[in-house]
A protein has these predicted regions:
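Catalytic NTP-binding/metal-coordinating core of nucleotidyl cyclase/transferase enzymes
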Residues: 273-351, 355-356
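Conserved acidic catalytic loop of the alpha/beta-hydrolase fold
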Residues: 82-100
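Post-His helix in hydrolase/transferase enzymes
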Residues: 230, 252-268
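Helix-rich cap/lid subdomain of alpha/beta-hydrolase
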Residues: 129-197
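Conserved hydrolase catalytic core segment
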Residues: 98-138
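Catalytic beta-strand-to-alpha-helix segment of the class III nucleotidyl cyclase homology domain
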Residues: 337-440
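Conserved HGGG/HGGXW glycine-rich cap/lid loop of the alpha/beta-hydrolase fold
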Residues: 7-71
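Short beta-strand/loop motif that positions the catalytic acidic residue
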Residues: 211, 217-219
Length: 440
């Protein structure tokens, strides 16, 4: 979807960028200093937002000099705010873009505002998402904002900081690892300290009255780190700016699960009409079941008896799905794929199926995982479905095998588990800790 990383020349420095295919308008994601354009388009947490944004324009990511894949700079020669803004010009010129929408996140607002004020003819619109003018000002913020810098320094490179500032973002070890990798490729821990000191001194209040482009200021109502007062000040200082407060606690408006209201505001602001955003991603528990030794049994029983047994098996499975409010997605010969909106009910349904089919003289295996699924009509897809299938493939006769993600969601339910160790799941990155249900 996105181009390979390419380079634009900003003075003597090369600025790395990636772009999606051309669209109706160009939308530049103005980065703060701790992102990496090589990684950010691939983050699992932002795929829904990216798909929506690329439906209304070409999305362009780039890295400021001294960060990510752009040229490094010495600690005593850090780029100025003006040079950061010039990076936008360099990328635009390289792409042949005459006018762009600027989408600026938190501290990136400073360079975006300077560009918009100095290059109004090349700025179609300015969007500030959890932006601020000067971080050291007294906005009446709570104690959480004071802890952000310290947390960033101590957690950098682990990915955990992203969960601290985005507490509503779905989280597991794979998501953490994806953010950790981006942090490590963005800047080093030593550079974090230098950049924090630099950006803490930025103040663009004086610039904002000179911003004469359409401006949309979006802010989450319960962001404890960059409070709504910071966003309101931006809207107050920019002539005719529109301020919209949205529900949510995340610092990033482009991550799950709250990106949709933000995107709808952006789409309406840019296109003049409200975008319809399909709620095509849901958190669900997926259950895979299949009959153990089905090929051998089919050969021994013959077609007629085997099909009769399959019909009886299918009736048992569907009865239990109805009992535990599961949704049948598909069948494949001797197996079922179903989804549940409750993880405990999914496990208990798998146990009930396992126990009930024994009266038919057969054994089943079951694998379960909880994760975000893509809804495609009556079908589902996404990495969570692949994980569930791989977990099921590792289950033995009469096993109900679950991922650690699912096990963690049912602690306190009375269900007991047997540790089955860590495993590589084919086609899925990382190691996965699996557990077998050990309850009667």
């Amino acid at each position: 979807m996105f181009s390979e990383t390419r380079y634009a020349l900003n003075g003597d420095l090369r600025v790395a960028y990636r772009a999606s295919p051309p669209g109706e308008r160009d939308i530049v994601f103005v980065p703060n200093w701790f992102t990496c354009c090589e990684i950010i388009p691939e983050l699992p947490s932002i795929q829904g937002w990216l798909e929506a944004m690329t439906s209304i324009g070409r999305v362009i990511f780039f890295d400021h000099p001294g960060t990510g894949a752009s040229d490094p700079v010495a600690p005593d020669a850090l780029p100025t705010l003006e040079q950061w803004a010039d990076g936008i010009t360099a990328v635009m010129d390289e792409l042949g873009s005459s006018e762009v929408v600027l989408y600026a996140v938190d501290g990136a607002f400073a360079s975006a505002a300077l560009f918009a004020a100095t290059h109004p003819s090349r700025t179609a619109a300015l969007i500030a998402a959890e932006g601020y003018t000067d971080p050291l000002a007294d906005y009446g913020q709570g104690p959480e904002s004071e802890k952000a810098g310290e947390a960033m320094l101590t957690m950098w490179g682990t990915g955990q900081f992203q969960h601290v500032v985005n507490p509503d973002m779905p989280w597991n070890d794979d998501i953490r690892a994806s953010w950790a990798r981006m942090e490590r490729l963005a800047v080093s821990p030593a550079a974090v300290e230098v950049m924090l000191a630099l950006t803490s001194e930025l103040n663009v209040r004086a610039v904002l009255p000179s911003v004469r482009v359409p401006t949309l200021v979006l802010h989450h109502r319960d962001d404890a780190f960059i409070t709504p007062a910071m966003g309101k000040l931006i809207a107050d200082l920019i002539p005719d700016a529109k301020y919209v407060e949205l529900p949510g606690r995340n610092m990033y408006q482009f991550v799950e699960p709250h990106w949709r209201p933000s995107f709808q505001q952006i789409a309406e602001f840019l296109t003049g009409h409200q975008a319809e955003v399909a709620d095509d991603r849901v958190l669900a528990t997926v259950l895979f079941t299949d009959i153990v030794d089905s090929t051998r049994m089919a050969a021994e029983l013959g077609d007629r008896n085997w099909h009769a047994l399959l019909d009886a098996h299918d009736a048992v499975v569907r009865s239990q799905l109805a009992r535990f409010r599961g949704r049948e997605v598909s069948t494949s010969g001797d197996g079922f794929l179903a989804t549940f909106d409750g993880p405990q009910r999914a496990i208990r349904c798998a146990m009930a199926i396992r126990d009930a089919v024994q009266a038919l003289g057969i054994e089943v295996r079951a694998g379960l995982h909880t994760g975000e699924c893509e809804v495609r009509g009556d079908d589902i897809g996404g990495i969570a479905v692949h994980i569930g299938a791989r977990v099921s493939a590792l289950a033995g006769p009469n096993d109900v095998l679950v991922s650690s993600t699912l096990r963690d969601l049912v602690i306190g339910s009375g269900l007991e588990f047997e540790d089955r160790g860590t495993h590589q799941l084919k086609g899925v990155p990382g190691e996965w800790h699996l557990f077998a249900v050990d309850s009667p």
